[in-house]
Curated annotation (Swiss-Prot):
InterPro entries from the UniProt entry: COG7
Matches recorded under PANTHER family: CONSERVED OLIGOMERIC GOLGI COMPLEX COMPONENT 7, CONSERVED OLIGOMERIC GOLGI COMPLEX SUBUNIT 7
Pfam family name, one: COG7
Coiled-coil ranges (or none): none
Record-given protein name: Conserved oligomeric Golgi complex subunit 7
Swiss-Prot/TrEMBL keywords: Golgi apparatus, Membrane, Protein transport, Transport
Superkingdom of the source species: Eukaryota
GO biological process, one term: intracellular protein transport
Cellular localization per UniProt: Golgi apparatus membrane
Role according to the record: Required for normal Golgi function.
Entry's family note: Belongs to the COG7 family.
High-level lineage: Eukaryota, Metazoa, Chordata, Craniata, Vertebrata
Length: 770
């Protein structure tokens, strides 16, 4: 039987009984079912008995074990209580121990302080006693003249004195000790000088040790500097008393200094802790003690050279100095990190310092030099052809002078003199343009372009025009080379002075300028020989201007700048003057003939047979000589203007496109000549002819009817010439022709739509009512 179901939570008696009967015999009768039920009852009774028995045993065991558990719990409670009492006692012991220990440590600290004070007092007493002992013995020690023993005594006294700072007579003891050190120094000085002079390493080491112990190392170095400085100064004196030129004297001095650097560095490395700094200071002191001084020698030599050669001589001297500086830089460079950079900067200043006054006024010196040299370039000669030739040759000379000035600026100022250079170049170009202008005026006079003889014969002479074309080509070469030079100048300025421009610089901002200086100071150590900058401190305004120039060149690019804008403008004006000269040389002959028009008496005087020809048609009249000469001259212009078309000259082409001709086309006119420079010139001369012709016609006071027809015939002839050349006659000339041809009774009708003043003037000439 399965009794486990009695333990289930959902146990149901009926279900269990039904299930038990279903599991019994299937084919039994009612009697068997009763038997099966009796069996089940019996089994249940047996099972109940077993359960009761098991419960009884379990209860009995529980009752037996209960006193033991209670006793264990009671014992555990007693042990816990005892443990609590013990922990309280331990806590109190710890607290008491802490209090006792704290008091003990405080006592120990106080005892230690007392001990330290007692030791300090004892040491002070010992040192005081030692000072007294040493002070008493020092005189006897000095009598021995044993420098090592004396030094040891003084070192002991010095150490004792350090313990006696708070004593009342401390200052007196300091004075006494310094006096004793002075006596030792005086006693040792002959031996020191002998050791340094003979370059005795062992003896020098002894003195270095002694003077280090008594804190007198600067005084020992002073002996060292004095010994070797005397030798170098004596060398300079010998050089100055010789007959050698200054550049040779400088070479001798610099060779001696460079030799001293190498020998003394090698020796000082064995003696001093900082040998490179010691030898650097030796050179600084030597350069500063030269008699006569280098600035004085340079000034005297430059003054003797005179204005013409002062800059040349100065650069020769500077080359010698720069060569020496390069030698020193190469000597210092391998050990630059071992050097005191402050002292190296002082050495750089000492080497280049004598040139600073000249570098600061470099711009003025360069300007004077360039003006003297450009004044020596001849531009005017007796003959026009020679003058034109000199103008052509002068271009190369001009830009040769300018390029040489740029080289001098880069070499002498390392680009820092750029502002002065630009001013000097501006003056150079201005002076050259002035000379060139004077030469053009001279050529005008020699060609008699401004003085036209009233009765001179009409002669064609194209020499002046051909010379003018060569001058225009020269102007084109000037403009071309000026553009190239300006580009080269910008690149050179950036390559030489660009290193001085800080990345943090902002233009026109003092704060940004100062920030850039601070940034430069905070930047990693650089080579002082390459960073020498005389301008920033001595002329900050010019330095700020230089920074703006460099910033502009860097930001906008070296091809987009206006370094020589004023000079370019002046050269463009020069080109314009050359154009005017060429134009006047062509137009002179035409103007000469046109000026005769208003002076002719035939306009208002009745000629022989005039009454017979009044009614003749206009075609029976022929143009007068003056207009025929002009017409033939204009017809020959294309042949003589042909060089503008056939000549392949880039400079001439540049000048022609840059120049502007007088008498530009009227508004509304067709401009076919603009595509060809020769046609452009032909059109300008033609318009000048027509305008001048109109002006002189309107100056005629009175014309007879016959003269009116003759004048109209002359105008028609000129208009036909213009048509033959493909040029457009001016409206004013056409209007005058129409007014001259109009019959008196039709004059008012013809003049409608024409300029009122023009119509009135022509009416007055003809005597027509208007």
């Amino acid at each position: 039987m399965d009794f486990s179901k009695f333990l289930a939570d959902d146990f149901d008696v009926k279900d269990w009984i039904n299930a038990a009967f279903r599991a019994g015999p299937k084919d039994g009768a009612a009697g068997k079912a009763d038997g099966h039920a009796a069996t089940l009852v019996m089994k249940l009774q047996l099972f109940i008995q077993e359960v009761n028995h098991a419960v009884e045993e379990t209860s009995l065991q529980a009752l037996q074990n209960m006193p033991k558990v209670l006793r264990d719990v009671e014992a555990l409670k007693q042990e816990a209580s005892f443990l609590k009492e013990q922990m309280i006692l331990v806590k109190e012991d710890i607290k008491k121990f802490e209090q006792d220990t704290s008091q003990s440590m405080q006592v120990l600290v106080e005892i230690d302080q007392v001990k330290s004070r007692m030791q300090l007092a004892a040491e002070s007493l010992q040192e005081a006693d030692k000072w007294s002992t040493l002070s008493a013995d020092i005189e006897e020690t000095f009598k021995t003249q044993d420098i090592a023993v004396i030094s040891a005594k003084l070192t002991g006294m010095q150490n004792s004195l350090m313990m006696l700072v708070d004593t009342p007579d401390y200052s007196e003891k300091c004075v006494h000790l310094e006096a004793l050190k002075n006596r030792l120094e005086a006693l040792a000085s002959p031996q020191i000088v002998a050791a340094f002079t003979s370059q005795s390493v062992d003896q020098s080491k002894v003195f270095v040790k002694v003077f280090t112990e008594i804190d007198r190392m600067p005084q020992l170095l002073a002996y060292y500097y004095k010994c070797h400085k005397v030798q170098l100064l004596a060398t300079w004196q010998e050089l100055c008393q010789s007959d050698l030129p200054l550049d040779r004297q400088l070479t001798g001095l610099y060779d001696a200094l460079l030799g001293a650097w190498h020998t003394q560095t090698q020796w000082a490395t064995q003696v001093f802790k900082n040998p490179h700094e010691v030898v650097t200071v030796l050179l600084i002191q030597t350069l500063g003690a030269l008699v006569p001084s280098l600035p004085m020698c340079l000034s005297a030599a430059v003054e003797r050279a005179g204005p013409e050669l002062e800059l040349t001589r100065l650069l020769e001297f500077y080359d010698t100095t720069a060569h020496f500086a390069k030698g020193l830089e190469m000597a210092l460079l391998p050990h630059l990190q071992d050097h005191n950079l402050v002292k190296v900067v002082e050495l750089v200043d000492a080497v280049y310092g004598p040139y600073k006054p000249f570098q600061l006024k470099y711009g003025d010196m360069e300007e004077n030099n360039l003006l003297i040299q450009i004044s020596a370039v001849p531009l005017e000669h007796g003959e026009v052809i020679d003058c034109v030739q000199e103008l052509s040759h002068s271009v190369h000379k001009l830009f040769g002078l300018a390029s040489a000035a740029v080289d001098r600026c880069a070499k002498f100022t390392n680009g820092l003199g750029t502002c002065g250079l630009l001013t000097a170049l501006k003056s150079l170009f201005a002076k050259y343009v002035s000379h060139f202008t004077n030469a053009l005026q001279s050529i005008r006079k020699k060609c008699k372009l401004d003085d036209i003889p009233p009765n001179s014969l009409f002669q064609e002479d194209w020499t002046a025009f051909q010379n003018s074309v060569r001058i225009i080509a020269t102007c084109g070469e000037l403009l071309r080379q000026c553009g190239d030079f300006e580009q080269q100048l910008a690149n050179r300025i950036l390559s030489t002075a660009g290193k001085y421009l800080s990345d943090s610089y902002s233009p026109r901002s003092l704060a940004g300028f100062q920030d850039s200086i601070l940034t430069d100071k905070k930047s990693p150590a650089k080579n002082p020989w390459q960073e020498y900058n005389y301008l920033q401190k001595d002329n900050p305004a010019e330095y700020a201007s230089l920074m703006e120039i460099l910033y502009t060149l860097k930001e906008k690019g070296s091809s987009n700048h206006n370094l020589l804008s004023a000079s370019r403008t002046a050269l463009t004006r020069l080109n314009q003057q050359a154009h005017q000269l060429a134009f006047d040389s062509v137009f002179l002959r035409i103007k000469q003939q046109l000026l005769l028009v208003s002076r002719m008496d035939s306009w208002n005087t009745a000629g022989i047979g005039e009454t017979l020809t009044d009614d003749l048609p206009a075609f029976s009249l022929t143009p007068l000589e003056y207009i025929s000469n002009i017409g033939q001259y204009i017809m020959s212009l294309p042949l003589n203007l042909e060089p503008f078309v056939t000549q392949e000259d880039s400079a001439l082409e540049l000048a022609l496109h840059a120049g502007k001709l007088p008498f530009p086309p009227e508004q509304g006119d067709e401009l076919p000549e603009l595509d060809n420079m020769a046609d452009n010139w032909l059109g300008s001369i033609a318009r000048a002819t027509m305008q001048t012709y109109c002006d002189v016609i309107l100056q005629i006071p009175e014309v007879t009817p016959h003269s009116t027809k003759q004048l109209a015939t002359d105008i028609d002839y000129l208009i036909n010439v213009m048509d033959a050349l493909g040029l457009q006659p001016s409206r004013t000339l056409q209007n005058i022709a129409a007014l001259l041809k109009a019959k008196p009774e039709e004059y008012r009708q013809v003049s409608k739509g024409l300029p009122r003043r023009l119509a009135a003037t022509v009416a007055t000439m003809r005597g027509v009512n208007y």
